Amino acid sequence: MYQINNKTWSIRLVRSDSPMLIRSDGSYTVGMCDRTTQTIYISNLLQGKFLRKVLIHEICHSAMFSYGIDMSVEQEELFCDLIATYGDEIIGIVDNVFRALKEVA
């Protein structure tokens, strides 16, 4: 369990054929963030770097829901994909620039 903006979220690993992983179009996905139950469902078949990427993506959704950030589904997916794919690189660059600025100051 974790909290974002005083909202408690839980993460559950579920079978890959769980109804919790069915999209609105009837297809299966590997991760799903349910704003109603404040639960993230992740396929128990995931591991390693892909599991981490899916967790980042779904936790990004939970942050958006917790802070009331409203976007179209397409925009929200693009944003969560951006953070899940490039977030480590962006934060690493910021950390390096921040350290360099502190050394100059």
Give, region by region, the residue ranges found by the protein language model.
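Metalloprotease/metallohydrolase-associated module, dominated by Zn2+-dependent proteases
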Residues: 1-50, 66-105
